[in-house]
Every structure is written in C-alpha cells, then in structure tokens.
C-alpha cells in the first residue's frame, strides 16, 4: 500500500491470523490505522460504515494554496477545512512531518492527492474531513 505519510504498512496473514504493521511515527500510524485497519475489522465483524470508526467523510475542497504531492503514492497532507458560503476550502500551514502530532490537532482533514499529482491553488480536490 503506497501512501504518504504511512509507509510502509504491513497487512497480511500469518498461520491463518491477520497481521498489521503500523509505521513508527504517530501521524502515519493514526492515518494507516484509520484508513486500513479499522475498515478491515469493521467488515470482518459486520459493522456498518455508519457505525464504524473512520477517519471522516470524503468531501471536495478548493485549495487556498499549493500542496505538494508524493511520487508514486497517495498523498494525505494535513489541511484545515473551512465551510464558507461559496463551499469548502482547504489550507495547509504547519510542518507536515509524520512525527508532528501537533498538526493533527490544528488541522481537521487530509488531502487525497493521487500519486504523482500536486494540488494547485484554486483547484478542487478530494479530501477527508475528520469526524
């Protein structure tokens, strides 16, 4: 699974038991757990998507600034989403390192930039808006 931050996560079976390996940095671990592990457990135990713990809801946001993507990986940059009369807007403004737990407090969403794609100011992209 090629995502940033979050690499490389491990997902598989060992002796008929599921195994998950999470990255060491807190932001990476949180995103991998929310996007991969929680949905897997929910599907195994028959928990509906509405009842399942998840990262948030997928929305479309207009970028207020350029956002760099990641080569060959889905890129989840932390963003601050605001709701205005014209729609939803997203801004990045803090250090994006995967060890920067503070960024998870001051931001309320992440970009979903496809591999090898940067987000340009004024562009509308998909994002997750945290619950």
Regions from the PLM with identified roles:
Residues 1-131:
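Flexible glycine/proline-rich
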């Amino acid at each position: 699974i090629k995502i940033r931050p979050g690499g490389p996560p491990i997902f598989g079976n060992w002796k008929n038991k599921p195994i998950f390996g999470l990255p060491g940095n807190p932001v990476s671990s949180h995103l991998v757990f929310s996007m991969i592990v929680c949905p897997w457990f929910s599907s195994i135990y028959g928990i509906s998507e509405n009842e399942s713990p998840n990262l948030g809801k997928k929305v479309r946001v207009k970028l207020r600034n350029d956002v760099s993507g990641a080569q060959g990986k889905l890129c989840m940059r932390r963003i601050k989403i605001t709701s205005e009369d014209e729609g939803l807007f997203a801004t990045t403004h803090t250090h994006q390192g995967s060890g920067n737990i503070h960024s998870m407090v001051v931001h309320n969403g992440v970009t979903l930039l496809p591999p090898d794609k940067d987000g340009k100011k004024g562009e509308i992209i998909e994002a997750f808006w945290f619950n």
